[in-house]
């Protein structure tokens, strides 16, 4: 319990450093670019994109508190820059919840492929499949059970692919030594 409390306190303290804010701003810019040029919408219910990678890097570097706030602000900014439909706070909540989950799994831990797969599976099942489908049902009235199978299949197909992409990119960046500037050595 004490370890969890310290993780949240340390992550919250990350918000007070200029370097954290600067890195978050750079990651936000990268996410906005990826959202504009590297996203594919397949109908109104399925979107494939890579703008979540900078979010996960922020969660990895700065933890669940900073990552959660970063994701919430970035989701709203993304909406204003490139709206894909009506604004709905449920999707912002989902971005924040996903960041919180990733932050809990990644922050101050050694990043392994198994850890990434597990974190991504939790996010896929809770956030992407259940909550996003619920919000789409509330917004468009298409029926939760009608769109659930399509969204489940898409997310389960993308789960290992997204996990591999994030893990590979993060490991490559880690090998350059850039992350060591912002992050203490991993514990476990």
Predicted regions and their residues:
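Loop-helix junctions at membrane interfaces
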Residues: 1-188
């Amino acid at each position: 319990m004490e370890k969890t409390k310290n993780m949240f306190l340390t992550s919250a303290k990350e918000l007070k450093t200029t370097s954290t804010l600067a890195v978050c701003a750079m990651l936000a810019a990268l996410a906005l670019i990826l959202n504009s040029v590297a996203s594919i919408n397949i109908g109104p219910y399925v979107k494939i994109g890579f703008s979540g990678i900078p979010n996960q890097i922020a969660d990895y570097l700065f933890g669940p508190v900073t990552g959660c706030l970063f994701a919430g602000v970035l989701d709203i900014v993304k909406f204003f820059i490139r709206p894909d439909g009506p604004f709905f706070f449920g999707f912002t909540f989902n971005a924040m919840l996903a960041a919180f989950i990733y932050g809990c799994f990644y922050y101050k831990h050694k990043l392994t492929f198994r850890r990434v797969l597990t974190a991504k599976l939790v996010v896929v099942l809770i956030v992407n499949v259940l909550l996003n489908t619920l919000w789409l049902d509330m917004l468009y009235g298409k029926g939760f059970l009608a769109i659930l199978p399509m969204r489940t299949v898409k997310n389960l197909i993308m789960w290992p692919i997204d996990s591999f992409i994030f893990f590979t990119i993060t490991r490559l960046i880690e090998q350059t030594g850039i992350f060591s500037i912002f992050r203490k050595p991993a514990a476990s």
